[in-house]
From Swiss-Prot:
<comment type="function">
    <text>This is one of the proteins that bind and probably mediate the attachment of the 5S RNA into the large ribosomal subunit, where it forms part of the central protuberance.</text>
</comment>
<comment type="similarity">
    <text>Belongs to the universal ribosomal protein uL18 family.</text>
</comment>
<comment type="subunit">
    <text>Part of the 50S ribosomal subunit; part of the 5S rRNA/L5/L18/L25 subcomplex. Contacts the 5S and 23S rRNAs.</text>
</comment>
<keyword id="KW-0687">Ribonucleoprotein</keyword>
<dbReference type="InterPro" id="IPR005484">
    <property type="entry name" value="Ribosomal_uL18_bac/euk"/>
</dbReference>
<dbReference type="GO" id="GO:0003735">
    <property type="term" value="F:structural constituent of ribosome"/>
</dbReference>
<protein>
    <recommendedName>
        <fullName>Large ribosomal subunit protein uL18</fullName>
    </recommendedName>
</protein>
<dbReference type="GO" id="GO:0022625">
    <property type="term" value="C:cytosolic large ribosomal subunit"/>
</dbReference>
<keyword id="KW-0694">RNA-binding</keyword>
<feature type="compositionally biased region" description="Basic residues">
    <location>
        <begin position="10"/>
        <end position="20"/>
    </location>
</feature>
<keyword id="KW-0699">rRNA-binding</keyword>
<dbReference type="GO" id="GO:0008097">
    <property type="term" value="F:5S rRNA binding"/>
</dbReference>
<dbReference type="InterPro" id="IPR004389">
    <property type="entry name" value="Ribosomal_uL18_bac-type"/>
</dbReference>
<feature type="region of interest" description="Disordered">
    <location>
        <begin position="1"/>
        <end position="25"/>
    </location>
</feature>
<keyword id="KW-0689">Ribosomal protein</keyword>
<dbReference type="Pfam" id="PF00861">
    <property type="entry name" value="Ribosomal_L18p"/>
</dbReference>
<dbReference type="GO" id="GO:0006412">
    <property type="term" value="P:translation"/>
</dbReference>
């Protein structure tokens, strides 16, 4: 019987490969995206210091309504606002091994519209 590939393991493998080449600094931190079946999470991370500078997710009260794509747009807007409040305008986008499509793209577009450059 042919075994079916585990999509999450393949995603984690892609993410590890990309993370070897991608790093966030204090000047240009990394915007990391994690997507689950029920929600989406975004963090602005300074990898040099190992500190999360700003974050937003569907667990926040402002975001919990709407479809998954609408929630991703709201998370992108919220993380951009929180990053701008801390003086962060440029980031490196880390899609977390996910395709740049759907909820990940919606979050990225919303973050760009609200002032983050990447």
């Amino acid at each position: 019987m042919i075994s079916k590939p585990d999509k999450n393991k393949l995603r984690q493998k892609r993410h590890r490969r990309v993370r070897g080449k991608l790093s966030g600094t204090a000047d240009r931190p990394r915007l990391n995206v994690f997507r689950s079946n029920t929600g989406i999470y975004a963090q602005v991370i300074d990898d040099v210091a190992g500190v999360t500078l700003a974050s937003a997710s569907t667990l926040d009260k402002e975001v919990s309504k709407g479809t998954k794509t609408e929630q991703a747009v709201a998370v992108g807007k919220l993380v951009a606002e929180r990053a701008n409040a801390k003086g962060i305008s440029e980031v490196v986008f880390d899609r977390g091994g996910y395709l740049y499509h759907g909820r990940v793209k919606a979050l990225a577009d919303a973050a760009r519209e609200n002032g983050l450059k990447f």
